[in-house]
Amino acid sequence: MEEFLDKLPQMDLMRSEKMTLVQLIIPVESAHRSITYLGELGLLQFRDLNADKSPFQRTFANQVKRCGEMSRKLRFFKDQIDKAGLRCSPRLEIEPDIALGDLERQLADHEHEVLEMNSNSEKLRQTYNELLEFKIVLEKASGFLVSSNTHAIGEEIELHESTYSNNGFIETASLLEQEMNPGHSNQSGLRFISGIINKDKLLKFERMLFRATRGNMLFNQTTSDEEIMDPSTSEMVEKVVFVVFFSGEQARTKILKICEAFGANCYPVPEDTTKQRQLTREVLSRLSDLEATLDAGTRHRNNALNSVGYSLTNWITTVRREKAVYDTLNMLNFDVTKKCLVGEGWCPTFAKTQIHEVLQRATFDSSSQVGVIFHVMQAVESPPTYFRTNKLTNAFQEIIDAYGVARYQEANPAVYSVVTYPFLFAVMFGDWGHGLCLLLGALYLLARERKLSTQKLGSFMEMLFGGRYVILLMALFSIYCGLIYNEFFSVPFHIFGGSAYKCRDTTCSDAYTVGLIKYRDPYPFGVDPSWRGSRTELPYLNSLKMKMSILLGIAQMNLGLILSFFNARFFGSSLDIRYQFIPQMIFLNSLFGYLSLLIIIKWCTGSQADLYHVMIYMFLSPTEELGENELFWGQRPLQIVLLLLAFIAVPWMLFPKPFALRKIHMERFQGRTYGVLVSSEVDLDVEPDSARGGGHHEEEFNFSEIFVHQLIHSIEFVLGSVSNTASYLRLWALSLAHSELSTVFYEKVLLLAWGYENILIRLIGVAVFAFATAFILLMMETLSAFLHALRLHWVEFMGKFFNGDGYKFKPFSFALI
């Protein structure tokens, strides 16, 4: 048997790849290039030899800091390009590699240029917005001034009091300079202040002015025609132009302070109509000049950003690679001469030749006089777990890894989950109409695979795309199980001709309840469509699906136990085979394996025996005659033997192994044997990284702890055999729920609406049926069946053999950054 097993071909996914711990001694002059080439290869996971040092104490901390600063500048350029509405269009030609120092200088120059252009543009934009506000104030305030001019004193009162609240506004406006330096002002005459304020502040602003002047003011306001950009916040807001008439220097001071507090911008407006028109022309002229200047600045800035955008993608990749290289170099140690860097890491055994060739090429390309020393080390801790997967198996491997990463070289459940997972899903989801809908969705994802793989997807879409092959297999198995159940959106199809049953005579009026006879062989595949609508439909389908669920569950749990045997055999643990695998197989199959056998015999013979009665009285009255419940000769003695075996298996699981471990431990430390004790149950307090091959410690053997752990493990298996078998009945329950929901939506929505002659009611019925099918049956039910299949694999199947305390192989690879 062992020779036969040894001759079987190796499976890539059955066990993780064999790993090797290697040491690298790299000369300083070729260190950077060597790490770069290893990152391109992506098959070496470095160990951090400076874990006790902070990031700032490491050798290449300054280089990492420089890379971080360059990353910040590149993010700044990316944000500026996005804000400008430009696209990063990388050059088609291959750019030569650029040194880190040269790239750093280029980025600094570009950043300085862009920041300077942004600053100038911001100042010009602020001036433009202020002039725009000034223009609006001139247009709106002139009406108030004309109406008030007839009541004003003959002496012209210019608005030198109307101080402009924004510092240094319009320093060169010739007419404005004249207006700000009037001849003389009557200190007791009527004055005014004009400006503009946000509309949402207007009521509070007016109330504050009224209280500050004790009502001795006249407030006029009008809304601007459109939203304008606020000069201080650069936000589009709705503003209101106001003119405040007052008297006295003290009132002027109070009003200006209130304007400043509320963020109102005050602008000087002359009373004379001619001067207003002249000032308006000057403002419009300056606005036109500023628009031309802003457009030219925007074009110049966009040209500069476009020149950056051509190389931005390559620069981002270069900086990321350089930072990853220096982060990896920080994990290496200098030797005593400070001329070489020493590193350690894990690599797959098959990759040693490739790594050696890469290091030789790095030595040659860097013109180093000394080559890189590459040699294998003796591993103490457990290696990382690495599986070589493809697009199809990767999704199933991720499902398993979500529960726990496999211990180094233990049996991998993902191999079997590729088939069992979609099949158990389909048992719960079996409807070939719904399966076709899932298939169309999976085919759409596969057809757009190349395009979607290069796009940035949302979290939900990314999850769907990553599981596209899982969805494909679930759809195919759902179609298969739906054909077995003979359900197409809950409707049975006569795929293989008519039913095997027909009416006894021509007077048979109800072919679903009475008068049916079987006139030919059973339906060749799937459920006979005549069961649909009959009085015995639910009892028949429930019996079929319940028994099928038990058979599938016992088969999968037995597969899990068989894998535990292969694990124990691979790790050389004969104790686990003799005192764990054998009694567990006996216990499970003496009870539930026997139940599965009875189900198959009953199906084959057509017996009317009550299996509930058989199993219950197998425990309560094992010696009583079975009577009409006897399925085969010798059933009662066989049941007694199986019951005794089940009772014997429990202490077999519990007692021998702890005592055998204590005996081996005592012999080992008495000098009679020096072999390393290898067992999955020896060192209960050992961390996962020392689970295999790390046995040079001399800890005190704690027999009580070993015994308690074995007791818990035995009780858990005994109780779990019952609960896990019952858990597989969810296959029956969810299949029944899915079928009944489909029937309700079909009969109570679609057929009911179709019974009306009104076309509107029919359309509503079709819409409701389509909505219920899509969102309840194809989304909620799919998710429910998916999660239940997940539970059956994680707990019922993997719990029989899977440790899941390993850690992933994470190589240094540029493809992963």
Swiss-Prot record:
GO molecular function, one term: proton-transporting ATPase activity, rotational mechanism
Membrane association type: Multi-pass membrane protein
The keyword DNA repair appears for this protein: no
Coiled coil ranges: 97-133
Keywords from the UniProt entry: Coiled coil, Golgi apparatus, Hydrogen ion transport, Ion transport, Membrane, Transmembrane, Transmembrane helix, Transport, Vacuole
Cytoplasmic side: 1-422, 490-547, 602-639, 780-817
InterPro entries linked: V-ATPase_116kDa_su, V-type_ATPase_116kDa_su_euka
Residue intervals on the Vacuolar side: 444-468, 569-580, 661-758
Subcellular localization: Vacuole membrane; Golgi apparatus, trans-Golgi network membrane
Disruption phenotype: Lethal.
Single GO biological process annotation from the record: proton-transporting V-type ATPase complex assembly
Main location: membrane
Any one cellular-component term (Gene Ontology): trans-Golgi network transport vesicle membrane
Alphabetized Pfam families for the sequence: V_ATPase_I
Membrane-spanning parts: 423-443, 469-489, 548-568, 581-601, 640-660, 759-779
Role according to the record: Essential component of the vacuolar proton pump (V-ATPase), a multimeric enzyme that catalyzes the translocation of protons across the membranes. Required for assembly and activity of the V-ATPase. Required during cell expansion.
Subunit (UniProt): V-ATPase is a heteromultimeric enzyme composed of a peripheral catalytic V1 complex (components A to H) attached to an integral membrane V0 proton pore complex (components: a, c, c'', d and e).
Family membership: Belongs to the V-ATPase 116 kDa subunit family.
Name listed for the protein in its UniProt record: V-type proton ATPase subunit a1
